[in-house]
Amino acid sequence: MPEPRFLVVRLGSLGDIIHTFPAVAALRESFPEARIVWLTHPRWSFLVKSSGLESEVQTVETRALSSLRDVIRRLRQDSWNAAIDYQGLWKSAMLPFLGGVTRRIGFSSATIREFGVPVLYTERVKTSKEHVAEQNGDLSLHAGAQRGTAPVNLQIPEREQASVCSILRAQRLERYVVLSPGGGWRSKCWPAERFGALSRKLRESTGLRCVVNSGPGDNDLAAVLVGSSGGAEPFVYSGNLGELMALLKGAACVVGGDTGPVHLATALNTPVVALFGPTDPARNGPYSSAEATSSGQKNIVLRASGVRTTHARDSQTHPSMLTITVDAVFDAVCRCIGVPR
């Protein structure tokens, strides 16, 4: 009997891919000999490969006509048992449709935000699950997996680990807390000034020095954070994705909003303090498998009560993020890392 051949479509972003890994892990667990081809944006090829779940990664730039033509041609040259669109957007659903995949699995209209997308699927899955990772798991179940989600073990290349260890050693950083102030939506970000005040409080009360994850476009935020830290000397670090993984893996705790680095830290089994405002942590919060939770991974989510969930992108901090105080986050970090307050 020929091996099953699955096309997994999840183009981005960092957090969304992290929340897709458990569902694909369940698919791999149920079909260990399957050929699983993951279609994603070139930026995330390294991340997908770090999961070890794929047989092959194909990349596509959906805004580049030549890239679209190339990937559609490659899809048409192959044969597939099914394509599973975990993204649920027009740009993701059209690829297996135009690529001639005859069995195309995706969410029903009740789950998808872009109107009309399910018309491109041959099989539409209704889900009652709340968290997106478990919603994704329902697609894997529909494709034949024995369970919806399974544990994921991300691999960090030795070169990136050695590079980060060398830098941290030079800074005399053995135990540290990572602060991740940035994010794709500024509305989901906690103010950089408060991160700075948190850094100062942690240094003064626990002796721990913080490392600031400064991603693309975060230089100004990092500068404000350092300037607000009262001489706590947080170390600003910028690196590639593999180095970020090594940095997060070695942290005592990671603090940030509903952003990729926080979800990546959770996938690496590093405790997180996640700060939520406009988005709902029940749907988009840090997701740990039952195995990770039973092994003692601690995650703490802070969100003001009564906040109305919205996915509207805004360039200003959402008012609900301002209700989260420095003292509340400090207390959560202390609980997370097991030090007295």
Where are these regions (language model features)?
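Catalytic machinery of carbohydrate-active enzymes
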Residues: 1-341
